[in-house]
């Protein structure tokens, strides 16, 4: 009685995993355009069958309260499977005690910020990394030096009388801010003697700090994103309204950084490619018209990631199809304890399958995307290859960008037990 699907001439991938998303995130006095309902449809359309979203513990909250808040946003709304990282912003003895149960039963992975209002200082970073080492968890860290960013924002106010020129944005978050924060994180991690994840690496300067630490024997996992591989800071010289669409943090960098990141992927020195999907509409992006520091930072990318890595990575002969599978599926599954249920096509795994047609020609447009965002950062990009069919736990749920079955995603625990 088995249904037979003819996939001759196609590639089969284990369902892709996007281990860096921000759905229904409240930030910059607004909330992301994509809630779990639309954001996970976008993921599914592109071939992603599981996301790991950042639940955030706000000041004064317990870790359980933070997770419950995210369950209210995600449960019953998600079209792909979903797990959570937990961003830690408030640290004390009570939270340290509570962490044990969370690491055992819910999530092995946590987020720390070195900038923003949610940042942790070096002492807190040391304490959290030490506790995670005890419990078997791991931290992914947003690496930018907050002092440099704040000083340059103030400097711009003094020298130019305001912050309206978006072309000044990358100057306020220079490559040195990333490199210094990466270096500092890795020194702290070395003192603790524990691995860490550097998320959304954007610069050659930051990468050099990682290589240096690895040469000294440290284990450092690295994530980058399609935007840092394919776009550059010239986007900030577009007319202001459009330039704000590309305001992300870390910002887009000089083009020369791209080949360093691609080479690192070719050599297997970067472990995962995620999206940092954090979408806002054109209207939401207008919030920074008088002061770009008030523009909500983030861009969409959920649906586009696999196709972009295929087109510019595999078709562009920078990486192989096998490496694409490793960076988009196998490695994130292994890193975040989702393997072998996710990230593999083996007996006993979840039967999350992407049937990839390498010959389908199509063009990326906002008009045809599932995201609630009303623009596509790669608008007009011509692609050869796409997720023709997407199976979630054995059920056909998407075909050629169209969603066939909504809201069938389930919550995936990935604690160490």
Predicted regions and their residues:
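Histidine-rich, glycine-flanked metal-binding segment
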Residues: 1-14, 414
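Divalent metal-coordination and catalytic microenvironments
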Residues: 9, 20, 43, 47, ...
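Di-metal (Zn2+ and/or Mg2+/Mn2+) metal-binding site signature of metallo-dependent hydrolases
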Residues: 10-37
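Gly-rich Lys/Arg/Thr-decorated short loops/hinges at beta-loop-alpha junctions or inter-strand turns
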Residues: 18-21, 48-53, 79, 159-170
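Alpha-helical scaffold segments that flank or form the walls of functional sites
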Residues: 29-83, 89-108, 126-134, 176, ...
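Histidine/acidic residue-rich metal-binding segments in metalloenzymes
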Residues: 94-273
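His/Asp/Glu-enriched, well-ordered alpha-helical/loop segment
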Residues: 164-193, 245-246, 266-267, 271-273, ...
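C-terminal cap of metal-dependent C-N hydrolases
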Residues: 287-291, 347-413
